[in-house]
Every structure is written in structure tokens, then in C-alpha cells.
Regions:
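Metal- or metallocofactor-binding catalytic centers and their adjacent structured scaffolds
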Residues: 1-39, 44-46, 355-359
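C-terminal (or distal) subdomains of carbohydrate-active enzymes
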Residues: 33, 37-455
């Protein structure tokens, strides 16, 4: 109910917003209490156990609360985030599917040399040569792996804003003529490097996007990945304004892939027909991707589900400021993260889908040593375990819901970290259809399969 269709777009009254905030905060607190109860650590102050909530192995940069200056055996650096919290970025931690790893904090900071060189408006990273314009947006980005210029049009991460007065429903609708009204906004107020080391560089900027509203943002470039992330805090005090972040790319392709539930949908990225023209605003979940045969750029986010795509341009919708029925509903502080990920291959599970999951699902951090046995894993890269839940009508059983994510055929083998008595294939209602002989499954493109695991 807290995700009801009148709550998500802001089309509810003020008291509902207030009640929902309290209820969600209470739900999150109870979830943390349950995690602490089910996964107790020994409380060792200088150690943490990291648990991977994903069904595939990961080795991306991990972010946890800093309890020391370094991490024993791993490249690391500390920084203060936009909330004023002291955090640590750690690289090189390999987490198996649903598995864990222990990290020990040290009093000695990592002394490895920085992988980045900033000279005026030019930034050199292990993956790209970047040039900033006077507003702090990325005017040029050359991929070192291909020598290719990626920017064509507005600089990457240009903020654009338009008047947003819908003809009918204030918070529900976006009218087609809004596209003609977008113009760059953002007066750069401050800009500084707040962290630079062997793991990443963080450039913190603050813009005024109007007389009343500001954006503060960390641009994060990584030594281990071509991804550029944007950790964003908006102080929003606008009415009937629509804000986007523009990424006008030099890619030439005839479609965009956008994630939906249990898969993705491919749409035209041109405006030739009336149907295509009506898709001036489309939806996505964790990613949208423009890919040629052997190169592409994914736009990844953690909570922003609307965007516009036209030829090589992707523009992520950051905020829509309707005033009815709650004129205060959108006012104040908003937090989000988004990123661009250039990849030197076409669209695949490894190039886009898995990094998008990693961006959205941070590992659980348990204080001290915690005894964690990996639940299960699947060996096909394009098969994802999307859900793990208790079985509705059986004790000593749980449900795995898996799906094929890339639009391809797959043979997949399940591996379990515990003894299994019986496996069966179920429908979505958990009604058994057949017993599973062994641990092998086949998947058609985007097929969802539900497995009952008895132990």
C-alpha cells in the first residue's frame, strides 16, 4: 500500500505523504532489526562481514561506513559523503553469489598512488580523457579503449529544465510540448576535489538551478570501471517545473533497451511515426542502454524511472514538480544516484545488466564476524535470481524465482550451499507443476521460472 499508484507520483493529499514517510521509516527500521537478529555478528570493532544479496559473483567497488583509515589487503580510501558521513570505498573484494567476505579495518591509510590526473578542466582517468565546460558538465569524453568521442550535442550531465503545466492531471501527465521547452540551467556555485586515491576520484559541485533550488553532486570516477556515477542531492523549491539530466551521445543505433520487470523492452529511438512521437517520455527500471554492434552506453539509476530518448540522446527525468493535490509534497530534499557506463561490446548481461544490479544492491554490512553460508548460485550469466521468499504452504521450504534477463536462450545449473531434499517447478502461485530431476534448468528468452526448494 505504501507504493500505491497515488503515492508514487505524488497525487495524494499531504497527510498521506506524512503517514507514508513515517510508515516506511518504521518498516526500514524493522528490517534492520530483523537483519541484526538473523545475521548476528560478534561485534568486533575493527572487522565487518560483507554479504552479497545478488545471485552472481561481484567485485565492484563497495561502500561502507568507515571505522578506520584503511582496509587490510584491499585498495581503499575514505571520504565524507554529501550527508556528512565518513565512508570508505573498497576495491578488490570478491563476493560469491549470496556469499560473504570479511574486511578488517586498519589505522593506516592506503598509500597507493592516485590513478587520476586533473589539470584545469581536463581529467585523465584509466578509461577516459574528460574535458569539463565552464558549468562543470562533461563537454568531451574520449574512451581510451577505442579513441572514440562519446559526446555529441549538449555536454554530458547538463541539467535542463522546462515549464510543466499539464493540460489535465497535474502530477500524472507530461504533455508532448514540454520537450520544446527544455533549456540548460545550472549556475556553478562551487567545485572541489573531495577525495582522490587509488580507488576513485570524487569531484563535488554545487549548482543553483533557479533562485530557490540547488543541486549538490559528487561525480565519481573509478580506477576499476569506466562507469561515471553521480551522487545527487536536490534542494527543490519549484512548482510546475520538470528537471532532467542530459546525456547526448555520439552513438548511432536504431533502438534503446530499457529494463522492465523480469526483462527489458526494446523501443525505437527515432520519431518517425505517430506511435514513436508519442513515446517522448518512456519508463525504465535500473537501466536504459543505447548499443551499436560492439559498443554502447548504459544510463543506470537507483530510483528515477522516466526518461526521454531521441536518436543518440538520453535524458533522465530527475524531478517533476506538480502542485496538486499537495503543494508541499515535492518540496525539500531529494536524493538519488545515476551513472553512465560505456561498454566495449554490445548489450549483454555482463556489460549492462549485472552492473545495473550491482549499482542498486549494496552488500549488507554486519559488524564483526558473521557466519554466512551462501544460499544458492546459478552459472548462467543471463539468468538472475530475482526473488527469494518463504514458501507459502510448506515448512522447511523456500522459493527461488529466476528469470532470463538478456532476451536469449539459456542452460543454467543451480548450486546450493546447503543440503537439498527435493526441488520442484511451480507456477507463480507456488502450485507444483513437476519435480525437478537434478539441478539443471532451461530458459527461453525472458522466461520466469519458480523453483520450490525443500531442505
Amino acid at each position: 500500500m505504501r507504493q500505491f499508484h497515488d503515492i508514487l507520483p505524488g497525487t495524494c493529499i499531504h497527510s498521506v505523504h506524512e503517514e507514508t514517510r513515517r510508515a516506511i521509516a518504521d518498516t526500514i527500521a524493522k528490517a534492520h532489526e530483523m537483519t541484526d537478529k538473523l545475521l548476528p555478528g560478534d561485534g568486533a570493532a575493527n572487522e565487518v562481514t560483507l554479504i552479497n544479496p545478488l545471485s552472481f559473483e561481484r567485485s565492484d567497488v563497495l561502500y561502507i561506513d568507515a571505522r578506520g583509515e584503511g582496509a587490510d589487503g584491499y585498495a581503499s580510501q575514505t571520504f565524507t559523503d554529501l550527508d556528512g558521513k565518513r565512508r570508505m570505498a573498497i576495491a578488490g573484494v570478491n563476493l560469491s553469489a549470496f556469499g560473504s567476505a570479511k574486511v578488517r579495518f586498519t589505522d593506516k591509510a592506503d598509500s597507493a598512488a592516485s590513478a587520476f590526473k586533473l589539470n584545469g578542466d581536463c581529467l585523465d582517468t584509466p578509461f577516459a580523457c574528460i574535458t569539463f565546460n565552464e558549468t562543470g558538465a562533461i563537454a568531451s569524453m574520449i574512451d581510451k579503449r577505442t579513441g572514440r568521442e562519446l559526446v555529441d550535442g549538449l555536454p554530458f550531465n547538463t541539467f535542463v529544465m522546462a515549464e510543466d503545466v499539464s493540460a489535465a492531471w497535474d502530477n500524472w501527465d507530461i504533455d508532448a510540448d514540454s520537450e520544446d521547452k527544455f533549456a540548460p540551467v545550472g549556475k556553478l556555485l562551487s567545485r572541489e576535489v573531495v577525495s582522490c586515491g587509488a580507488v576513485e576520484m570524487r569531484i563535488r559541485s554545487k549548482w543553483a538551478i533557479s533562485e530557490k533550488s540547488t543541486i549538490e553532486q559528487d561525480m565519481v570516477v573509478s580506477a576499476a570501471s569506466p562507469m561515471i556515477a553521480f551522487d545527487t542531492v536536490m534542494d527543490w523549491h519549484e512548482g510546475h517545473r520538470f528537471l532532467k539530466a542530459a546525456f547526448d551521445t555520439a552513438l548511432h543505433c536504431d533502438g534503446v533497451r530499457s529494463e522492465i520487470q523480469f526483462g527489458h523492452i526494446r523501443r525505437s529511438n527515432h520519431r518517425s511515426t505517430d506511435v514513436e512521437k508519442a513515446r517522448f517520455e518512456i519508463c525504465n527500471h535500473k537501466y536504459s542502454d543505447l548499443s551499436e554492434n560492439s559498443y554502447g552506453i548504459a544510463l543506470i539509476n537507483d530510483c528515477k524511472y522516466g526518461l526521454s530518448v531521441n536518436e543518440g540522446s538520453m535524458r533522465l527525468s530527475l524531478h517533476k514538480g506538480g502542485l496538486r493535490p499537495d503543494k508541499e509534497g515535492d518540496m525539500g530534499r531529494h536524493v538519488c544516484r545515476y551513472a553512465i557506463l560505456p561498454h566495449c561490446e554490445g548489450f549483454s548481461a555482463q556489460s549492462v545488466i549485472q552492473p545495473a544490479y550491482e549499482f542498486n544492491y549494496a552488500p549488507l554490512a554486519i559488524s564483526g564476524n558473521a557466519d554466512v553460508t551462501p544460499l544458492a548460485s546459478v552459472d548462467a550469466k543471463n539468468v538472475i535470481v530475482e526473488s527469494v521468499k518463504p514458501c507459502e504452504d510448506a515448512q522447511h521450504a523456500y522459493i527461488l524465482r529466476l528469470y532470463e534477463a538478456a532476451g536469449d536462450y539459456a542452460n543454467a545449473n543451480l548450486t546450493f550451499g546447503h543440503a537439498v531434499k527435493r526441488l520442484s517447478i511451480c507456477n507463480m502461485l507456488e502450485e507444483e507443476q513437476s519435480e525437478l530431476d537434478g539441478t539443471s534448468l532451461t530458459f527461453k528468452p525472458f522466461q520466469i521460472r519458480t523453483v520450490k526448494v525443500e531442505y
